[in-house]
Design a protein with these regions (language model features):
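A generic tandem-repeat structural signature
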Residues: 81-148
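Short loop/turn segments that connect beta-strands within beta-propeller blades
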Residues: 58-62, 103-106, 146-150, 187-190
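Beta-propeller domains
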Residues: 49-69
Length: 191
């Protein structure tokens, strides 16, 4: 009888200890740190995308902070990030072409491209950050994002697959695909 009572008490206290360590506040998220595919750096932290998830590494205190849909981002599966030193904000592009701008730990959503019904192929090929703007080279043309105002400034539907763009000497250059060694040039007027 004494052994049975000891076993019951031991079991009771074991379950009590396990219950004390159980997370009752909700889900715990484990993000992958493998297969890093995008890294951007600010003055005080490094932004990293690994397997579609975003985290930051604090340079001063070696801290790691995770960002995901459950704690402030507006979508899942990040495909690309770009940091704008002028606006001190991070442009986040998701696989479905949804866009967030992260500034001071707060994400502002720009769903224009992902929710547009007039654009069929919404693939974002690359991003150029210049001044306070981000130029998104897409399967249909160029989308200009004003990162300071957190808004879509312009959309240029060129019916061309623009893989990248560059700004030099007051002009914006865009290579044409599939024609090699041909490019489209336009006058660069940011305002």
């Amino acid at each position: 009888m004494r052994h049975i009572l000891t076993i019951i008490l031991f079991s009771f206290f074991s379950f009590t200890v396990l219950a004390a360590n159980f997370n009752t506040t909700g889900w715990k998220t484990y993000l992958s740190y493998n297969n890093t595919n995008s890294v951007e750096e600010s003055n005080d932290q490094v932004f990293v995308v690994a397997e579609g998830s975003l985290y930051t590494y604090g340079k001063d205190d070696n801290s790691i902070k995770q960002y995901y849909k459950g704690n402030g981002l507006n979508d899942n599966t990040i495909s690309l990030i770009r940091y704008n030193k002028q606006t001190k904000s991070l442009l986040i592009i998701y696989d479905n072409s949804n866009i967030d701008i992260l500034e001071g730990g707060v994400a502002t959503n720009l769903p224009y491209l992902s929710t547009s019904t007039s654009i069929r192929d919404k693939q974002i090929n690359s991003v150029l950050v210049h001044d306070e703007y981000a130029y998104l080279s897409t399967a249909f043309g160029i989308v200009v994002v004003n990162m300071a105002k957190k808004e879509i400034k312009d959309t240029y539907k060129l019916s061309l697959n623009i893989t990248s763009c560059a700004i030099q000497n007051g002009n914006i250059y865009m290579p044409l695909q599939p024609i090699k060694q041909k490019y489209l040039r336009g006058l660069y007027t940011p305002h």
